[in-house]
Each structure stands twice: as C-alpha cells, then as structure tokens.
Amino acid sequence: MRYLVDTHTHTIVSGHAYTTFLENVQEASNIGLKVLGTTDHGPSMPGGPNLFYFNNFKVMPRKLKGVTLLHGCEANIIDFKGMLDIPDFTQKKLDVIIASLHDVCIRPGSVEENTEALINVMENPYVDILGHIGNPSFPINEEVVVKKAKEKNVLIEINNGSFVSRKGSEETCKKVANLCKKHKVNIIVGSDSHVCFQIGRFPKADNMLKEIGMPEELIINNEENKILKYLKNKGKLKDLNLD
C-alpha cells in the first residue's frame, strides 16, 4: 500500500533526533508524501523543546516543496488522570496532537492505571492520535481503549518504530490492529522518525496490516485528504482550503 501522509516525525528540536525541519520536508517531498506532520516531543521529555517553540508555529509555512505541513506535538501524558505536558492555550494552537506514554516522563503503572491514563486523555478535545499504545512497557486493556477511541473519534496509531525500538511491541500492535478492525476504528500509521530517512517508511507496520487484512477505509493516511478532513472537522486547519 502507498501511504501519502506521515504525522509522526521528529526534528533535532526533540533532543534525540538527528535532522532538521527543512531536511525532513525535503525528504518528504523526495518520496512523494503529500502531508507531513512535525510532532516534536513535549517539554517534559529530557532534551525536549520549551513551550515557546510550540507557541511560535505561526511563523511556519502551511505548504512547502509540494507538501502540506502540520505543526503539532507528541505530547507526553504525565499522570494517570491524562494530563499533558503542554497547557490548553498551547494545545488549541496546534494542528495535530499525539498523546503518548513515555517511561522517562511517567512511571509505567498497572494495566488499570495505564488504561485510565489513555481513557482520560481521550476526553481532551485537542487530542487527535494515541501514540504507540502497543508499547509493552505500558500494558493496557486494549479493547477498552479501542472502544473509547471510537466513541471519542480519536485515531489509534500503528507505530512502525515500535516494531524496532520497543521489544515485544509486535504482538501487542497486532492485537490492537485486530481490535480496530473488529470495532471499525480508524487507524493512522506513523513512522516515529528520528532521522529524515525514516519518514514515510512503514514496512513492518504495513506488513502486519496486510497480514490481518486491515480494511483500507480504516487507514487514514493512505489518502491525502482523509487526515486533513478529519482535523478540519475538529475545528483545526482553519486556514487550509481543501479542493
């Protein structure tokens, strides 16, 4: 399957990634991506950017080198109540927010605690995507989370990077994907790139989705406008006109 969108990418601003915004855009253009999300880590990540970075996206272009640009954040969930490490006044300015659990920002809890964190964060209307919920460091009740995502119209990410960097993720990601298929919940495949050469490349995630027969209509990033319409329907991207 050809993917035209990657909403989960990092720049050197994240502190442990290795390419710049412009290098990422150039690579996205080179491989034919139509939409690129820049979602650097929130400020509680060691080495991450401060809030001024996220509050200054007004200076950034909407399109560059034939690529529509989404300026967002992979925000860290910092407690089991679903609190994020960026305040509401920043959240409302962003094009896209991925909410993720990272063990350097919150201690892994019990299945009940981790599930509660994800359930609670989906009550936040600015959250668009749950990031890498297949991470075995944070065991969850996958079916409860998937059903809540459908109720709250939140996208479930299938994170290609998890297959490589988070040992044991493959089985959980497959379980999550099968539940999304069962309950007809929209998913989005993300590279979680920390260097430009990973952008738009989802081989392991794509192979798994093919293996389980994931319906293409549930995959948001196999067309350019699916993600843009999704975000506009949430009141975002007000400056963007869709042809």
UniProtKB/Swiss-Prot annotation:
Keywords: Hydrolase, Metal-binding, Zinc
Co-factor(s): Zn(2+)
List of residues binding Zn(2+) 2: H16, H41, H194
Binding site for Zn(2+) 3: E74, H102, H132
Residues reported in the UniProt entry to bind Zn(2+) 1: H8, H10, E74, D192
Cofactor annotation comment: Binds 3 Zn(2+) ions per subunit.
Domain of life: Bacteria
One matching Pfam family: PHP
Documented EC number(s): 3.1.3.-
Gene Ontology CC, one term: cytosol
GO molecular function: phosphatase activity; phosphoric ester hydrolase activity; zinc ion binding
Family indicated by similarity: Belongs to the PHP family.
NCBIfam families: PRK09248.1 (NF006702)
Name of this protein: Probable phosphatase CBO3379/CLC_3322
